[in-house]
Amino acid sequence: MSRSSRRLRFLAHALLILAAIVPAWGAQSEAPHAARRAAVIAKIDGGVAIIPSQLANPRGIQDSKDFYYLTGAAQPEAVLVLAGDAEKREILFNRAGKWAGDGIPGSLEVRAMTDLRSFLPRAIRDKKAYVSFPGLDGTLEALGGSAAISGAAAILPIDPILSELRMIKSPDEIQTLQKAVDITAEAFVEVLKAAQPGMTEKDIDAIIQFTNQRHQATSSFTQVASGPNSVNIHFGSTPRVLQAGDVIVFDLGAWFEKNTSDISRTIPVSGKFTPEQAEIYELVLSAQKEAIRLMTPGTTAIKPQEAAEKVLLEGLGKLGLVTDPASPWQRRLYIQHGFGHGIGLDVHDVWSWWSPKMRTETLKPGMVLTMEPGLYFPAGRLEQVPSMFKAQASEEELKAFVARVGPVYAKYAGIGCRIEDDVLITETGNRVLSTAAPKEIADIERMMKEPSPFNQIIK
């Protein structure tokens, strides 16, 4: 029997057993969703909010997280209407004309979708209509075209209102996110103990999926990027065989009760970092710690990212990998992505470090954000510098940089490193939710010496 067949047989048996012993999720309370709807009504100033259950985007039709946020359920072809008039009406229109699903929102009036065509023009006449623009075309088509809301006094996006609400997590949301984070941390610990030369990225991926399923969670994404794959910012997993001397860059997320975690870690396949790998790892870890230290209420949101970049560029200068830490083009060579975003109902949830708004926005208690600095050294990248940055620097400067940095860069070529934690902003500072996933070199190397039952199965 092939290795993949043995692995699948093991997972199938394990999941059947776990299905019998893991309790089902408890029914969720309607109260948080009712409170959110009331908050929207309070913000639309007598207007009418129209939130479809599904949105169209380049990847096709997707369930609206805003709709779920306000109702606690996903329903196809439904529209939630919140009227900010004196009656404060909350009406859900769907095909059945009745609620179909668990956790019935008792305060919602449910009507047939066919009623919406006649209801909406009257409800919004001379009032502000707040709509989800990404889903507006599909909603209007179902209602008979743009004439359905032509009588509104103004047509405005609902997204800013919902983003502001979703940005601050309730205690229930934080508890759910913590569970999702704990599941992901457990998956990381399992692969930390199991990973060894001769396994494949897919073998590691299978352990992660098993751990998620054990807790009735599913993967929101899984990156197991080893060796030369580790220098890719976004990756999945392949049948590539892990080799001694490789690092693996993990980027893992688990959906639990509609919320997702997001944790990145980097480990050495051999169980011990090489000196060069350790230098890069400690630099990235130092940058992350400095950024997390600054993630406190009242701090301008961009400051943690800027602090992490400063630590990285100064450290790269000490290693001989940059000649001028203040050079914009040298920054672009090494800083290849933003260092964080919000998490919640979406992996990138209504908030990102790279948003222009974050240069003025301040961090607030209840936000849950990632911090994920990374450095990547693809082989051959330095040779591309003269063509990559010819518009930013002279040919002489670029060639001199390559000549000076090239021998140093060669020592680190093929190394990728990213470290990501999920951080809750509190009233007095912050709390890292993902501490159960080891990130100190000594802890990683110690844990990689521990036995794993998966090594008896995946051979």
Residue ranges and their predicted role:
Residues 11-23:
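Bacterial N-terminal signal peptides
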